[in-house]
Design a protein with these regions (language model features):
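Bacterial Sec-dependent N-terminal signal peptides
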Residues: 1-14
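Cell-envelope and extracellular/periplasmic
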Residues: 11-246
Length: 246
């Protein structure tokens, strides 16, 4: 049954699948890149700085046009997210990774003078120009630590950001998959509650748990947890898409 379900899906759905990975430092990646995660992923293509796709390898955020220093870019959830999806679907996965560490949600919004929204949208459109048959499948979002003290309007602002991206991409029902931030810091309690409410506050949104994940410092997941988080993002995408594989 599972094999039939997968074959039927593959036969019906032949467009190239693009995933948009956004957020702050845990999406950028701050965990050490271990030996097992240095391998290139032949079935995963990463948009480079010139608008072309290359075989993905860590650090995935190195081509972000809003990132901080290159030496800060390490292992995020995107590597194991894309690795898991490509293995499950036995198909090529395309990524735009455009994160920036230490950045509050409001800086990513369309009208913010920092211009991160415009720069991010330009990279997504570069990707879509590269392949006419490419379709954004989901926005993968991991952010919140920088809003730990400024959380009151978080859900309203995030809803506005997601709505703007969907409008500018012409996909009003584009799935939005958010991840919980780490739960080890009591200072996160208010923003953790806001993030938990995302599925009830934003249409076509879902949430990935950070339960039992561990950290390397005050803000960041360790390498083991980034692997688990990436796999959880992949599982959530498959779940909401109704794709049955293994």
């Amino acid at each position: 049954f599972l094999l039939v379900s997968f074959l039927t899906y593959a036969q019906q759905d032949t467009h190239k699948r693009l995933f948009i990975l956004l957020g702050q430092s845990n999406m950028s990646g701050r965990a050490p890149i271990e030996n097992a995660d240095t391998a290139a992923l032949p079935l995963v293509k990463l948009l480079d700085a010139d608008g072309r796709f290359e075989v993905a390898r860590n650090p995935l955020n190195r081509f972000s046009n809003i990132r901080k220093g290159i030496t800060m870019q390490k292992l995020g959830p995107g590597y194991h997210f894309a690795k898991t999806l490509s293995e499950q679907l036995q198909d090529t996965i395309y990524l735009v990774v455009n994160a920036r560490g230490g950045t509050a949600l409001e800086r990513f919004m369309k009208k913010d003078p920092a211009g991160y929204y415009k720069k991010t949208l330009s990279r997504i459109k570069q990707a879509l120009r590269a392949y006419p048959d490419m379709k954004p499948e989901a926005i993968i979002w991991h952010q919140g630590e920088s809003n730990r003290d400024d959380y009151q309007n978080y859900l309203n602002h995030l809803n506005k950001l997601v709505t703007d991206l969907r409008t500018d991409l012409g996909i009003p029902d584009l799935p939005f998959i958010a991840g919980e931030i780490g739960k080890w810091n009591p200072d996160y309690s208010h923003i953790v509650k806001r993030i938990a409410a995302i599925p009830d506050s934003i249409s076509y949104a879902s949430l990935v748990s950070s339960e039992e994940l561990t950290n390397i410092d005050e803000f960041h997941f360790d390498a083991k947890s980034q692997k688990i988080l990436g796999e959880r993002y992949a599982k959530k995408y498959l779940e909401i898409s109704g794709i049955e594989v293994t």
